Amino acid sequence: MCVVFSPREIVSELDRFIIGQKDAKRSVAIALRNRWRRQQLEGQIREEVMPKNILMIGPTGVGKTEIARRLAKLAGAPFVKVEATKFTEVGYVGRDVEQIIRDLVEIAISLVREKKRDEVQERAHINAEERVLEALVGKTASPATRDNFRQKLRAGELDDKEIEIEVANNSNNSAPTFDIPGMPGAQMGIMNLSDIFGKIGGRTKIRKTTVKDAFKPLIDDESEKLLDQDQIIQEALCITENDGIVFIDEIDKIATQDGGAGAAISREGVQRDLLPLVEGTIVATKYGQIKTDHILFIASGAFHVSKPSDLLPELQGRLPIRVELNALTKEDLRRILTEPEASLIKQYIALMATEDVHLEITDDAIDTLADIAVDLNARIENIGARRLQTVMERVLDEISFTAPDKAGTSFKVDATYVRQSVGELASDVDLSRFIL
């Protein structure tokens, strides 16, 4: 399922979206390549090769989450991002850490289902076309009549004609499930029962729609008929175990310092619950059991108050690769504004173009934006590249508000305009603390 890249290619791909942080990119690139290397092995040694989990250390807004997210997208692997602070020790009210793996399985099933849908799309389209023809001419029409209508259908001559179609009734698919007390991971509820009875009874509903709009629901309906649900689940469980990536953010918030009590005990409990998950255990899900031995865990934290050594020694040992991400400089912020494929500058220019407004942001304006962001990060709170979004919104506030009334016009944003928009706020510490 995963796409294979060399470490150099992975870093090159990440460079398209993330500025700097070479060490972090190299570490995740090697970790991803090692998964492919492991899968080329055979026999006992393949089971013995464990993923080298990663701990990213660095201030907020420097690219920790983005690196992990882009990596998973690049690999086509199941990926889940969680915050360590959202979980509680087993026995306390709240989410337990095994929910991470259950969420990962759900994501894997969605990935596999989409892949399988693409594989049967052509066949589903043919079947959907036959059903549209049946709705137009009936089941008893002669082959000549069907062929005549098929030509008209493909030419788009019948797009606006209204027909009635019969599709599966999926209205109960979003019904809730419930955990069975005393059996973590085992679930039973309305959804499971409706699945059982839905398949036996083949519940359908009649929809009145145009020929053009009928194709999508019919293709979806036909795709579902062609999919083997058991095969999807088995493949999803396999890629979860071998290709899954779990990103645990804010792990520094559950690190306990000496002398802590009360809440610190619960935080230590979360760490202890994470230990078997990271080391390798079996988690029960409603689709089957998942071995976590070969799931890659990437943890990250700013470690402003605590330090990595405040984590439980056992957990530190299970995060062997340490990567420190650097705080962003003015040059980094300037590059973030302009270089990535979907940089902030390109995003705002594209947004204004939808209103037929031509937006030009000069080089000196970009320098000034980076200057202001660096200054605010230094004086108030260092939130990294996220500060650029705050400053950009403030600068373009007036242009965004009046854009619908000024179609066909051009706006030029230079250094003077930037200073006029945020200069006074940026220089007033009390105001900038609240507004920027």
Swiss-Prot record:
Please give the GO cellular component terms listed in this UniProt entry: HslUV protease complex
Where does the UniProt entry say this protein principally localizes? Answer: cytoplasm
Tell me one GO molecular function of this protein.
Answer: proteasome-activating activity
Where are the membrane-spanning stretches?
none
Where is the protein localized? Cytoplasm
UniProt-listed Pfam families: AAA, AAA_2, ClpB_D2-small
Q: Known SMART domains for this protein?
A: AAA (SM00382), ClpB_D2-small (SM01086)
Keywords tagged on the record: ATP-binding, Chaperone, Cytoplasm, Nucleotide-binding, Stress response
Keyword Methyltransferase applies: no
Which InterPro entries does the annotation name? AAA+_ATPase, ATP-dep_Clp_protease_ClpX, ATPase_AAA_core, Clp_ATPase_C, HslU, P-loop_NTPase
Query: What GO biological process, any one, is recorded here?
Result: protein unfolding
Q: Among its keywords, does the record have Iron-sulfur?
A: no
Write out the residues that bind ATP.
I19, G61, V62, G63, K64, T65, E66, D249, E314, R386
Q: What does this protein do?
A: ATPase subunit of a proteasome-like degradation complex; this subunit has chaperone activity. The binding of ATP and its subsequent hydrolysis by HslU are essential for unfolding of protein substrates subsequently hydrolyzed by HslV. HslU recognizes the N-terminal part of its protein substrates and unfolds these before they are guided to HslV for hydrolysis.
Membership in a protein family? Belongs to the ClpX chaperone family. HslU subfamily.
Q: Tell me the subunit arrangement.
A: A double ring-shaped homohexamer of HslV is capped on each side by a ring-shaped HslU homohexamer. The assembly of the HslU/HslV complex is dependent on binding of ATP.
Please report the name of this protein according to its UniProt entry: ATP-dependent protease ATPase subunit HslU
**In the UniProt record, what gene is named as encoding this protein?**
hslU
